[in-house]
Amino acid sequence: MIGKGIRIEGLSKRFGKGDTAVYALKDVNMQVAPGEVVGLVGPSGSGKSTLLKCLGAVIDPSDGRMTLGNEVIYDGGWQVRDLRALRRDKIGFVFQSPYLIPFLDVTDNVALLPMLAGGANAEARAKALELLTALDVQHRVHAMPSQLSGGEQQRVAIARGLVNRPPVILADEPTAPLDSVRAMAVIRILNDMARKFETAIIVVTHDEKIIPTFKRIYHIRDGVTHEEAGEGREFE
């Protein structure tokens, strides 16, 4: 059984072979505890997107080891049989754009994943409503995506990422299109949800407004990471 938190050890990704091989990631080490939100920052082309794709089982790493809770999921090769189930049930995604399905209402946008996993419709909608209530958009459950504000759409996207209670959330530039007030609201929500559901959250960002809120930050440049303590500034 997969538990909580994520640990990455010696993770590398190279393209090509032999003398012509190019490393996009080199010996990356990270650890994110249950209930923790960490920042991953770096310039364009530094390897952030490649790292997220490896962590999300979208592409295969070349070397290294990844552990979710107490289960090794990658050790020189994938240790789980069904990568689609891993992505659906164990790793949640929040993107810069919400990517809500335009012809489904708010509830069904969130409930779709547990339905696809074989859950009963009523149970899936109950899970969706619980999260939408926690995110203070319960009054919009029957609205269509086009009727929502940008901030409401992002909260629905966060609910969708959390609905299967994944141990890990990968958030890729979740505040990029938002002003300062809405950006801080999203980060506050991610922190609240991390604590509530014991989720480990990695936030990839260029957003200078939110970087001071992280207690721990991983910097990545040329595929190499190093960790430093963040300010952990209180939300205004």
Task: Label the model's feature ranges.
Residues 163-167:
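A short, proline-enriched helix->beta-strand linker immediately N-terminal to the Walker B motif
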Residues 104-113:
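Short coil-to-helix segment of the ABC ATPase nucleotide-binding domain corresponding to the Q-loop/switch region
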Residues 73-92:
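ABC ATPase NBD coupling module
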Residues 169-172:
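Catalytic Walker B motif of ABC-type/P-loop ATPase nucleotide-binding domains
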Residues 64-75:
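Conserved ABC transporter NBD signature motif
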Residues 56:
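Helix-to-loop junction immediately C-terminal to a conserved catalytic motif
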Residues 144-154:
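Conserved ABC ATPase signature
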